[in-house]
Regions:
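Alpha-helical transmembrane segments and their immediate juxtamembrane cytosolic regions
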Residues: 1-168
């Protein structure tokens, strides 16, 4: 269900994202970050599936899923590309590791430094603080709040795009 929601909102967000990035409603030049998150979620699902398999050779499809997720992220021009998919996987695999914050911080730094054309993504590193402080418990979980957070992404991009087109 989570993947279906990501897919739905990736589709809904694409037109405003294209408008923001290219000034056109349709473009294959860039794809929004929800596609990256969707690919990352599918790779994480494959990793969970592989944990249930007793034989090493039975886990090969999960390894293939990592490669396919990376390639689709790169070829699909998703925000942050295949490296973003791997970053999602890093956060997933280290979620229960003691000292995870250090691994995630180093991973994010290396990602920002080596895998993005501009170093401006380094400014996103303070966003790790709320992630590190997350206690693992679900917060308020009614549908209005849940879909409000999902809707925020395409709505704010659309507003910024319209402002950029007509005000600035």
């Amino acid at each position: 269900r989570y993947a279906v929601r990501l897919l739905l909102f990736a589709l809904l967000s694409e037109l405003p994202f294209n408008l923001m990035c290219t000034g056109q409603w349709f473009s294959l030049q860039y794809q929004n970050v929800l596609w990256t998150l969707l690919l990352g979620a599918l790779v994480c699902w494959a990793m969970d599936w592989a944990k249930t398999k007793p034989e090493m050779w039975q886990r090969l499809p999960a390894d293939a899923a990592i490669a396919v997720g990376f390639i689709l992220g790169q070829w699909g021009n998703t925000d942050y590309g295949g490296w973003g998919v791997l970053l999602v996987l890093l956060f997933y695999l280290t979620r229960e590791v003691r000292g995870k914050w250090a691994i995630q911080l180093v991973g994010m730094f290396l990602f920002c430094w080596f895998c993005t054309p501009w170093r401006t993504e380094l400014l996103a590193m303070p966003a790790l603080l709320p992630i590190f402080l997350y206690n693992g418990e679900r917060g308020l979980s009614n549908r209005a709040v849940q879909y409000g957070f999902y809707a925020f992404y395409p709505v704010h991009i659309l507003i910024l795009s319209v402002l950029a087109q007509y005000v600035f």
